[in-house]
Every structure is written in C-alpha cells, then in structure tokens.
C-alpha cells in the first residue's frame, strides 16, 4: 500500500499509542520522520528513539513517555501542512503553540527545526505539525 502522507501516519500512530498508553511504537523510517521524532525526543515528549532494520525495511522504535500513574505527556498532535493544502510561514510569522507551551515543527532551508529555533535562525518554512 502506498502511503500518501507519511508524516500524518507517524503522528497518528503516536497519538493512538498515547491514547491506549502503549510503551513502544514502531513506524517505517524516513529522514523526515527521524527528524520529527528527534525533535520530540529533545523536547521531552518521548523517552527514547531507536533505528533498526526489519528485513529490508528501516524502522523507528519510539519509546513513549508518561508521567506518574501513566499520565500522558503528549496531550495533542496536529498535522498542519498537508499534501492537499501546504501551509507556509515567513520568518516573522512563525507560529507559537499554546503561547510557547507546545512546539511547532517547521521544515526550513536549515533543516527541520522547532518554532523557537526557526525564530532564532531567522527563517520561515513549511509548518509540518503542532505538538503539545
């Protein structure tokens, strides 16, 4: 089956695992998925990220992170720029998620970065998703 939106697939798998409080999520790997997962790791939304090979397919194993009593750390994930409707922002229009409590993932000419890093670098780009 050909996947039309691999980023939405990644976010949906993480969202579904978060709802039922799974410890581990496995998704097919790509450079953009790896970059988004790395941002989630550095921002503290997931516990661990591991890349491995399953036969001929590269996979990402994402270890979910929960608080005490299995409280969710990730309260929301939203895909913003979709294949049918791309959303871009200029360097002075970089969005803030929940007044800075969340993270916007932006694809820029300097790579895939958070909204704070994009503001610091002074670049705009395609707004991929919001995480809060």
From Swiss-Prot:
Cellular component GO terms held in the UniProt record: ribonucleoprotein complex; ribosome
GO molecular function, one term: rRNA binding
Keywords assigned by UniProt, alphabetized: Ribonucleoprotein, Ribosomal protein, RNA-binding, rRNA-binding
Gene3D superfamilies: 3.30.1370.30, 3.30.1490.10
Family matches, as Pfam families: Ribosomal_S8 (PF00410)
InterPro entries with a match to the protein in the record: Ribosomal_uS8, Ribosomal_uS8_CS, Ribosomal_uS8_sf
GO biological process: translation
SUPFAM superfamilies: Ribosomal protein S8
Assembly and oligomerization: Part of the 30S ribosomal subunit. Contacts proteins S5 and S12.
Alphabetical list of PANTHER family matching this protein: 40S RIBOSOMAL PROTEIN S15A
Primary role: One of the primary rRNA binding proteins, it binds directly to 16S rRNA central domain where it helps coordinate assembly of the platform of the 30S subunit.
HAMAP family xref list: Ribosomal_uS8_B (MF_01302_B)
Family statement drawn from the similarity comment of this UniProt entry: Belongs to the universal ribosomal protein uS8 family.
Protein name: Small ribosomal subunit protein uS8
Lineage, uppermost ranks: Bacteria, Bacillati, Bacillota, Clostridia, Eubacteriales
């Amino acid at each position: 089956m050909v996947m039309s939106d691999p980023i939405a697939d990644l976010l949906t798998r993480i969202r579904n695992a978060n709802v039922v409080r799974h410890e581990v999520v496995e998704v097919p790997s790509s450079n953009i998925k790896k970059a988004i997962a790395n941002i989630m790791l550095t921002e503290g939304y997931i516990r661990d990220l591991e890349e491995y090979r399953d036969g001929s397919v590269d996979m990402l194993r994402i270890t979910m992170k929960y608080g005490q009593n299995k409280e969710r750390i990730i309260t929301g994930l939203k895909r913003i720029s979709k294949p049918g409707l791309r959303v871009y922002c200029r360097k002075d229009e970089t969005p803030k998620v929940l007044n800075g409590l969340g993270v916007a993932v932006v694809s820029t000419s300097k790579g895939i970065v958070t909204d704070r890093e994009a503001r610091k670098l002074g670049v705009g780009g395609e707004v991929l998703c919001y995480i809060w």
